[in-house]
Amino acid sequence: MASTNISDREKALNAALAQIERSFGKGAIMRLGDATQMRVETISTGALTLDLALGGGLPKGRIVEIYGPESSGKTTLALHAVAATQQAGGVAAFVDAEHALDPVYSKALGVDIDNLLVAQPDNGESALEIVDQLVRSTAVDIIVVDSVAALVPRAEIEGEMGDTSVGSQARLMSKAMRKIAGNIGRSGCLVIFLNQLRQKIGVTYGSPEVTTGGNALKFYASVRLDIRRIQTLKKGTEGEYGIRAKVKVAKNKVAPPFRIAEFDIIFGQGISRMGCTIDLAEKCEVITRKGAWYSYNGENIAQGRDNAMKYLEENPEIAATIDQQVREKLSLVNAVFPVETEDGAEEQGEDGDF
């Protein structure tokens, strides 16, 4: 009797699933184990330390928020992701709501500016409508919105300077997230929102910092990155040549959150790949350090971190070998679209800082 009931329930379930697929299309509902692609594809951030902290990189088909103070590296990080996408043959779009995109700097970071789609909308509604249409097209692999704070509602732009419009931007973002979120998963497009910080007034306990645009983006984002400048890089009499950035993974739905990554950003050049390689190679014991001396395969290669980076830049074959050894030890073999594996997640879970 029990087996008959189970058989009847299975038939009823299969009939319901078939009806749902006829009504809403193939793939509208499925058993999780039957999914054709179980693992989330990712896009490199340009910083190997951050890729590791994210479990492979920025996830495709998701919303990502990057926020932090001014001049902390938000746009640089996003442009590196754009460059990685283009190098893999993907299509990239940049919604420049701040009207501040620098083509020369973008090109220096590896962005193909001739094929980069750029929009400079006049108001927030236009910007988010452009994003929605690009996502629906399923032909774009990555979209960067710079920034949420510059997505000013049309009513606020057309109104007087003294008019009050409480919560208008938050309502705009909430509606946009509802429209965009469903389409992103089907298109496989990565949408990156850059955001600014504001100070809450009268906060006694906890951080007074808050991101603009309300709470909708916080909930819909699969990954939230908090990027800060922790050090200014100086070299003798040459003065400042870059910054040391620290990124905290404040939220991550596809890998363990709350990890921390650090990397160098060189003015005019972007994220220092060699700096990330040296840091991780030392951590993985591919390169050893005794005092100020760095050694590889038992031979001293340079004295001091800057000289070690210079040595790798002058010896690209050795640098490529070290980079490959580091990626193999950390289960990050694919340079452009690394895929998180179960083994890699377990290995990475042992350490929180990179």
Curated annotation (Swiss-Prot):
Sorted UniProt keywords: ATP-binding, Cytoplasm, DNA recombination, DNA-binding, Nucleotide-binding
Gene3D superfamilies per UniProt: P-loop containing nucleotide triphosphate hydrolases
Keyword DNA-binding in annotation: yes
GO biological process, one term: SOS response
Inducing stimuli: Expressed in light grown cells, strongly repressed post-transcriptionally by UV-C light, repressed by H(2)O(2) and SeO(4) but not by SeO(3).
Signal peptide location: none
Transmembrane segments annotated in the record for this chain: none
Pfam family, one: RecA
Molecular function per GO: ATP binding; ATP hydrolysis activity; ATP-dependent DNA damage sensor activity; damaged DNA binding; single-stranded DNA binding
Subcellular location: Cytoplasm
UniProt GO cellular component terms: cytoplasm
Main localization category: cytoplasm
InterPro entries, sorted: AAA+_ATPase, DNA_recomb/repair_RecA, DNA_recomb/repair_RecA_CS, P-loop_NTPase, RecA-like_C, RecA-like_N, RecA_ATP-bd, RecA_C_sf
Keyword Nucleotide-binding: yes
Binding site for ATP: 68-75
UniProt xrefs under PROSITE patterns: RECA_1, RECA_2, RECA_3
PANTHER family per UniProt: MITOCHONDRIAL DNA REPAIR PROTEIN RECA HOMOLOG-RELATED, RECA
Miscellaneous note of the record: This bacterium is considerably more resistant to UV and gamma irradiation than E.coli; the E.coli-like SOS regulon model is not an appropriate model for DNA repair in this cyanobacterium.
Family of this protein: Belongs to the RecA family.
Role played: Can catalyze the hydrolysis of ATP in the presence of single-stranded DNA, the ATP-dependent uptake of single-stranded DNA by duplex DNA, and the ATP-dependent hybridization of homologous single-stranded DNAs. It interacts with LexA causing its activation and leading to its autocatalytic cleavage.
Protein name (Swiss-Prot/TrEMBL): Protein RecA
Provenance organism: Synechocystis sp. (strain ATCC 27184 / PCC 6803 / Kazusa)
